[in-house]
């Protein structure tokens, strides 16, 4: 039996444009930041906005203030979830513990990697499922960007590998469930999923009425692996669900704080809610209800909504409408998760020489269920798949690895997904950007490097998606900005190369992630499309100028035509009235008028048809 030393992390990546000037302007209105800034700039140079990330500024106090979420926890009444960190500043509640700070590989102070741990209170019921939340931040002043990830570590009990496959199965199932029901990880989307959930007269959310949660429970009852015991089933279909979304709401809040600080967006300050209530520490359902209700209370405390708006809140969906109403321009830049599995075998091996680790069936099961979950119906089609997860163990036992074809197929898949091989580590990645690291010693630095590499690659993709949205808007509304879009995309390619250099220890993994996401091809296609649209816009401008020239020429031509007609008419000043009655003059004027009208109608028809076809092709391209 293989000794189990498995760790599992869910990653949620974000990318934020950094506005240094705006950051300091907002900092002036924050008590926590104004003191730090005044102390730092006391004897600094005149150009205060030229330096943002000087080493003296990147201190624990600044980052704790930057990521402080005690207001959110206290305001929703759930401050007992996390283990507090004792700080020299007692007036600031904090849960962050800095575990790593180092300059990037290029040695410049303007780019630094910061890592913080947020430990879940072991006495709290959430600790039954999750152990800690790690926050990764990379501030890059040169490229005016902030990238990072939230890494959620599962609490996995020490057991044999076969029994732990259920945790991996549940992770795949919740990931698939969220992917099919959440367009993106954000407050708005979570609130929408809890729509139609009733709020009683006491202001409490009745989660029993939640169709979204009921959908999860129905899936779990059909798919939950290994156990039909009612107690175990309740833990997964209710307690786990509530705990998972409590953490997601917290992650969304932290991301909102960073967005508010770093971007020119309409964000409000998260102030402490005066309505603090205490409740039992073993009720995840109440945690989730409190956090959802805190959104409504927070808007009321900050006077962002009227009393009339509050009185109309009868369902969670109504809270979502308020959020959309007052945060309509809020960008959402939190990606769906990747999962990192880290496994330490019971015996140290030299992976350069052989693959003895995969001689056991347990090791093969570990590889298949993490890297090829589709074999067990755990991929994106898991919900519609007829395979019941209780049959995983039996299904796996039926696989005959003594069959040369089966074994060769397994070896081929293993080599295809292999990214990195050293004497101490085997690193695999599948097309979902899930990573399996089999390592003799689980050093934290190795885990950090993997997370950073995935973070950098996904941050580039997030930025590319942003540019594609901006391009579509400009293509329709203001094509004159297409050239600036092209410059932004080209800068993104240089930023991608910069991040590859920052991931030098795992550059192969970085390249593999980009390959799976087809990032380079996406950028090339977008550049070609921008060039094509810009060329069309250039030709369109030429046609407009040509049309204006033709119209101008026609106007002058008409004037000259009438001048010419007037000269050939038999009209004199003395006999004007008699001349107008002359039928010859009437015929000449009539013929001239018909010719002019025909010319004008022809020109207008041609121009209108060309404009119509241009707009039609643009809309249906």
UniProtKB/Swiss-Prot annotation:
Segments passing through the bilayer: 240-260, 548-568, 587-607
Compartmental location: Cell membrane
Keyword set, alphabetical order: Cell membrane, Membrane, Transmembrane, Transmembrane helix
Annotated protein name in UniProt: Uncharacterized protein MG241 homolog
Domain of life from the UniProt record: Bacteria
Signal peptide: none
Primary localization class, coarse: membrane
GO cellular component, one term: plasma membrane
Membrane topology label: Multi-pass membrane protein
Record keyword Transmembrane present: yes
């Amino acid at each position: 039996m293989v000794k189990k030393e498995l760790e599992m992390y869910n990653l949620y990546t974000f990318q934020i444009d950094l506005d240094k000037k705006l950051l300091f302007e907002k900092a002036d209105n924050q008590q926590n930041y104004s003191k730090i800034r005044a102390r730092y700039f006391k004897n600094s140079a005149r150009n205060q906005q030229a330096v943002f990330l000087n080493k003296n500024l990147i201190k624990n106090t600044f980052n704790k203030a930057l990521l402080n979420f005690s207001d959110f926890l206290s305001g929703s009444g759930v401050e007992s979830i996390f283990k507090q960190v004792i700080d020299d500043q007692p007036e600031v509640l904090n849960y962050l513990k800095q575990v790593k700070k180092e300059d990037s590989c290029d040695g410049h102070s303007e780019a630094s990697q910061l890592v913080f741990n947020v430990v879940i209170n072991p006495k709290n019921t959430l600790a039954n499922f999750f152990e800690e939340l790690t926050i990764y931040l990379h501030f890059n002043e040169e490229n005016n960007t902030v990238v990072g990830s939230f890494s959620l570590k599962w609490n996995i009990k020490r057991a044999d590998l076969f029994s732990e496959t259920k945790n991996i199965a549940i992770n795949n199932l919740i990931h698939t469930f969220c992917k099919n029901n959440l367009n993106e990880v954000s407050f708005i989307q979570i609130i929408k999923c809890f729509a139609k959930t009733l709020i009683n007269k006491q202001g409490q959310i009745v989660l029993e009425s939640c169709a979204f949660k009921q959908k999860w429970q129905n899936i779990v009852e059909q798919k939950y692996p290994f156990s039909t015991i009612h107690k175990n089933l309740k833990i997964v279909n209710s307690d786990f669900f509530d705990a998972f979304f409590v953490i997601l709401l917290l992650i969304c809040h932290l991301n909102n704080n960073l967005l508010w600080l770093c971007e020119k967006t309409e964000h409000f300050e998260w102030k402490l809610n005066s309505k603090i209530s205490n409740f039992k520490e073993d009720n995840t359902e109440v945690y989730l209800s409190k956090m959802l209700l805190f959104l409504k209370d927070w808007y009321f405390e900050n006077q962002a909504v009227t009393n009339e708006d509050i009185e109309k809140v009868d369902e969670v969906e109504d809270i979502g409408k308020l959020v959309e109403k007052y945060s309509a321009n809020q960008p959402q830049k939190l990606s769906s998760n990747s999962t990192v599995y880290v496994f330490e075998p019971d015996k140290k091996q030299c992976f350069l020489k052989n693959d003895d680790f995969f001689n056991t069936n347990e090791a093969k099961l570990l590889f298949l269920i993490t890297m090829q979950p589709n074999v067990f119906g755990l991929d994106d089609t898991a919900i519609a798949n007829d395979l019941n997860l209780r049959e995983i163990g039996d299904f796996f036992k039926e696989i005959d690895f003594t069959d040369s074809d089966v074994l060769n197929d397994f070896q081929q898949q293993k080599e295809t997904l292999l990214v990195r091989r050293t004497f101490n580590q085997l690193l695999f990645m599948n097309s979902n950007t899930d990573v399996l690291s089999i390592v003799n010693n689980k050093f934290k630095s190795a885990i950090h490097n993997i997370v950073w590499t995935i973070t950098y690659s996904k941050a580039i993709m997030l930025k590319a998606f942003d540019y594609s949205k901006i391009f579509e808007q400009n293509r329709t509304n203001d094509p004159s900005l297409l050239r600036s879009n092209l410059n932004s995309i080209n800068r993104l390619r240089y930023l991608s190369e910069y991040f590859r250099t920052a991931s030098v220890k795992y550059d192969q993994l970085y390249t593999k992630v980009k390959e799976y996401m087809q990032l380079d091809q996406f950028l090339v296609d977008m550049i070609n499309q921008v060039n094509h649209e810009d060329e069309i816009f250039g030709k369109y401008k030429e046609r407009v100028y040509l049309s204006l020239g033709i119209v101008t020429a026609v106007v002058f031509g008409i004037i000259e035509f009438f001048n010419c007609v007037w000269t050939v008419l038999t009209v004199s000043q003395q006999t004007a009235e008699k001349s107008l009655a002359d039928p010859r003059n009437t015929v000449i004027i009539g013929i001239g008028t018909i010719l002019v009208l025909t010319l004008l109608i022809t020109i207008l028809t041609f121009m209108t048809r060309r404009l119509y076809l241009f707009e039609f092709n643009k809309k249906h391209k």
